[in-house]
Amino acid sequence: IAFQSRTTTDQTPKYLFSPPGVKLPLFPVVEPIHDSIVLVEGIFDVINLHDKGLTNAVCCFGVKNVTTEKLQVLSVQGIQRIDVFLDNDEAGQKGSEAIRKLCEEVDITTRNIAFGDKYADAGSLSQTQVDKLRNKLYG
């Protein structure tokens, strides 16, 4: 059993785990759309996307929780592409690059999703924005 919490301030790290150092799985297990998933940082991001119909969203509980082992499991499950949608801040963009490099090691392609608004993230998207995103990703 493990617990995860997230700070609501600018404190780093954003995500705290108990017991310290525990590695949580990617959550939830989903059916891919066109052999792909959307990877987001936090639980509220994934809840918002699922609630608005983008049901192949998966949360990593923070960038440092993504490992080649977890990506290999996704590959075995048939995932061929990960659409990375991390927070649109400097840390999120660095995290997107780190995840892209890990995905290259296991032959999973990536696309980076970024909104022009610095503060836009998956947890703050409206229904209209999620519909547009889904249409752009999957037609």
What are these regions, as identified by a protein language model?
Residues A120, S124-G139:
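Short, small/acidic-rich helices and loops at N termini and domain boundaries
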Residues I1-Q77:
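Phosphate-handling DNA/RNA-contact segment within nucleic-acid enzymes
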Residues T109-Y119:
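A generic structural motif
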Residues N56-A57, I82, T109-R111:
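Hydrophobic anchor at the start of a short beta-strand
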